[in-house]
């Protein structure tokens, strides 16, 4: 860690977890894109819901659970189907579909299977992420496409609003360029399989490749399944020298290059929390 990076008990780069993952209202509205599915003839089950909505920022585990429920399957069925699913993932993914289960609205019928649903999600991601503009954007930021999806997943998890996404992406790139650890709570939340705004000193000592307080660079995989807005932010972030950000209160995320200013912002966040004000995201 660089000398200009504060100790964990002094500072928190971000105070936003993925509590919003479960709140589908506004998120779903931005992902209601109908995607046709492949189905398997001869597969029958009780009447399923007409569609399955996958919100932006859901983790793969959440997607698997949602598929099980939508198709009236025993818990864990979709996850167990992965080795036989034959998903067309990039080589860098190593068979892990995290980041490529594209958020959208998927139609269901009595013949829909976990394999057909997951395949549709991955194929949709492939169409969105593998065009020439995406490849060119990744090259501009000195990343390959899989790394760009990883950055987009962090942006999706950390940005309080779509307007913040570009700045969050710029913070990621600025810290990477300076050899600073990302110090993103969202990566720790992923490692610990949780969603929280609270990160302790003990959490930051976790021995995990997803602990961006201890490990340099990007996490080894995406940490959720980002949407197109987050991907655009990762490919073309605005210019800026920001290194820190914190959502002091809903709708008030402050970005700065100054450690002193950031510490003041974090202190204000803490005061708001102690007063029992609205949860910052």
Task: Give the role of each language-model region.
Residues 27-33, 154:
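Hydrophobic core
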Residues 17-20, 25, 36-133:
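Signal peptide-directed extracytoplasmic domains
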């Amino acid at each position: 860690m660089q000398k200009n990076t504060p100790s964990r008990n002094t500072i928190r780069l971000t105070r936003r977890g993925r509590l919003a993952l479960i709140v589908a209202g506004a998120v779903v509205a931005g992902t209601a894109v109908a995607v046709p599915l492949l189905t398997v003839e001869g597969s029958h089950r009780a009447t399923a819901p007409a569609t399955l909505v996958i919100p932006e920022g859901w983790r793969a585990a959440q997607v698997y659970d949602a598929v099980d429920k939508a198709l009236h399957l025993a818990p864990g069925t979709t996850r167990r189907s992965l080795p036989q699913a034959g998903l067309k993932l990039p080589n860098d993914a190593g068979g892990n579909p995290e980041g490529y289960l594209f958020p959208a609205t998927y139609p269901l019928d009595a013949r829909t299977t976990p394999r057909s649903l997951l395949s549709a999600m991955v194929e949709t991601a492939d169409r969105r992420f593998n065009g020439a503009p995406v490849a060119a954007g990744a090259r501009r930021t000195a990343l390959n496409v899989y790394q760009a999806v990883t950055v987009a997943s962090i942006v999706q998890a950390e940005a309080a609003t779509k307007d913040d996404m570009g700045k969050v992406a710029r913070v990621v790139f600025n810290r990477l360029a300076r050899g600073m650890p990302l110090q993103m709570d969202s990566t720790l939340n992923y490692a610990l399989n949780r969603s929280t705004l609270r990160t302790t000193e003990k959490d930051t000592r976790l021995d995990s490749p997803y602990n961006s307080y201890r490990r340099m660079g990007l996490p080894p995989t995406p940490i959720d399944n980002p949407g197109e807005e987050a991907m655009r932010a990762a490919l073309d972030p605005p210019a800026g020298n920001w290194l820190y950000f914190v959502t002091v209160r809903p709708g008030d995320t402050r970005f700065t290059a100054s450690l002193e200013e950031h510490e003041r912002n974090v202190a204000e966040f803490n005061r708001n929390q102690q007063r029992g004000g609205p949860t910052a995201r």
